[in-house]
Amino acid sequence: PEQPFKTLSAVNALTLNPGDRVLLARGCVFENQYLHLRARGTKEAPVAVESYGEGALPHIKASGTGLWYQNYGQPLDNPNHVWHGYVSSAVLLYDCEYIRLRDLEISNDPGLLPGERYNQGDKMNRTGVAVVAQNRGTLHGITLTGLYVHDVKGNVYDKHLANGGIYCVCQKPEQENGEIARYEDLHITRCRVERCSR
């Protein structure tokens, strides 16, 4: 665009194509915002989401926003294990490939609501970054580098749903005859993860 976007919701509405770059200004804090992308680059021209300028890393501060629905498609081996439900993610890469996230600060801590406890059983599931493969078979070339992910307070009981600092998962395809979801060339480098719980 000729003018910079003021919110991440404008970025979420885009279809990102090979070679596209989303540049977030250093020193900016995206309060109560999230970045949920469905982007497909190529090996020669990956999609890039990264910082520019000088100063502190751009901070995506979800604070409990960015809800999406995780569903494994069938009950798990233990009836006590939760296999579907809502998750709050500051950054969600859903069926993305050939994409690079670099030099971002990410957090997702809304604080405790009145009457809520840290270890409450029905507490919201939360991630800093969630990478989900489901309906496109093998996803290639996903790189997370130089991320500072911190203060993500998820549900300490729902171990099968997305919870924690950086969470990558393959789910059952929605189509019965869909190709099995998997990753190839998924790289997580130089990332710092602090004060995160599942």
Describe these PLM feature segments:
Residues 2-5, 95, 138:
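Soluble non-cytosolic domains of exported or imported proteins
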Residues 20, 33, 45-47, 89, ...:
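The right-handed parallel beta-helix/beta-solenoid scaffold, focusing on the short coil/turn
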Residues 23-30, 38-118, 151-157:
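Right-handed parallel beta-helix/beta-spiral solenoid domain characteristic of secreted/periplasmic
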Residues 11-12, 36-40:
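Short linear motifs in intrinsically disordered
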Residues 34-37, 67-92, 115-135, 157-183, ...:
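Extracellular beta-strand/beta-solenoid scaffold signature
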Residues 46, 50-55, 97-108, 137-153, ...:
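Right-handed parallel beta-helix
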Residues 15-17, 40-43, 53, 136-138:
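Extracellular/periplasmic catalytic domains that process cell-envelope and extracellular macromolecules
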Residues 1-25, 29-31:
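Acidic Gly/Asp/Thr-rich repetitive segments characteristic of extracellular carbohydrate-active
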